[in-house]
Design a protein with these regions (language model features):
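Active-site-proximal region of nucleotide-activated glycan assembly enzymes
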Residues: 30, 50, 109-166
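An amphipathic, basic-hydrophobic alpha-helix
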Residues: 63-92, 102, 110
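Conserved acidic residues
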Residues: 2, 89-91, 136
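Conserved nucleotide-sugar phosphate-binding/catalytic loop shared by glycosyltransferases and other
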Residues: 3-9, 29-73, 153
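Short amphipathic alpha-helix
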Residues: 14-25, 39
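Residue-level detector of alpha-helix initiation sites
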Residues: 11-12, 16, 98-100, 122, ...
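Structural motif
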Residues: 7, 34, 95-96, 118-119
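An aromatic- and histidine-rich active-site surface loop
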Residues: 38-42, 92-111
Length: 167
C-alpha cells in the first residue's frame, strides 16, 4: 500500500477537511500527518494516523523584527519535513495549506514526491499561492478559484460523510 502524507495547519480550517478525508483515504493508503505542535496535533489525536511534528513559524505580517530569525527557522523546518517524509516513505503529499504546509511541500519537491493541494477559500491563502506551481494540481472548493491557477481543478470541499447523512 502506498503512503499518503496529509499536511496543513495553523487553524482548524486547514485540518478539519483532512480529517473528513481520512476514512476514505485509509482504505487505499497508509496515512501519516505532518504538522506543527499546534492545533492540528490536538485535532489529529486519537484518529489512528501517525503524526510527525515540524517546528515551523508563521510569518508575522508588518513586523520585520519578529521575522528576523524566520529564514533560519524555515530552513530547519524544511529539513525536519524532509526527514519526516523520508521516514514515512512518502509516495504522495496532500496539502490543505496554511503556514505548516509550506516546508512540507518544499521538502516533498526536493524528494521528487508528487503534491496535490486543496484551497477551501474563494481567495487563495498565501501558502497555497506560494506552493501552487510546485503541485501537480490545485484542487478548489469553488469553480472561480480553480481559474486562478494554471493547474487548478474544481472539486468542491471535502466534508465528513456524517454531514451528508444529517448526523
Amino acid at each position: 500500500m502506498k503512503t499518503l502524507i496529509l499536511t496543513g495547519g495553523g487553524s482548524a480550517g486547514h485540518v478539519v477537511p483532512n480529517i473528513a478525508l481520512i476514512p476514505a483515504l485509509r482504505e487505499k493508503f497508509n496515512l501519516v500527518y505532518i504538522g506543527s505542535d499546534g492545533i492540528e496535533r490536538d485535532l489529529m489525536k486519537g484518529r489512528g494516523v501517525p503524526y510527525h511534528t515540524v517546528h515551523c513559524t508563521k510569518l508575522v505580517r508588518g513586523s520585520v523584527l519578529k521575522n528576523i530569525a524566520m529564514p533560519f527557522r524555515f530552513l530547519k523546518s524544511v529539513s525536519e519535513a524532509k526527514k519526516a517524509l523520508a521516514a514515512a516513505g512518502a509516495d504522495i503529499v496532500f496539502s490543505k495549506g496554511g503556514y505548516v504546509a509550506l516546508p512540507v511541500v518544499l521538502a516533498a519537491k526536493k524528494l521528487r514526491t508528487p503534491v496535490l493541494t486543496h484551497e477551501s477559500d474563494l481567495t487563495p491563502g498565501l501558502a497555497n499561492k506560494i506552493i501552487a506551481r510546485r503541485c501537480r494540481a490545485v484542487l478548489t472548493s469553488f469553480p472561480d478559484t480553480a481559474k486562478l491557477f494554471a493547474n487548478g481543478i474544481y472539486t468542491g470541499a471535502p466534508i465528513r460523510t456524517e454531514l451528508l447523512r444529517g448526523d
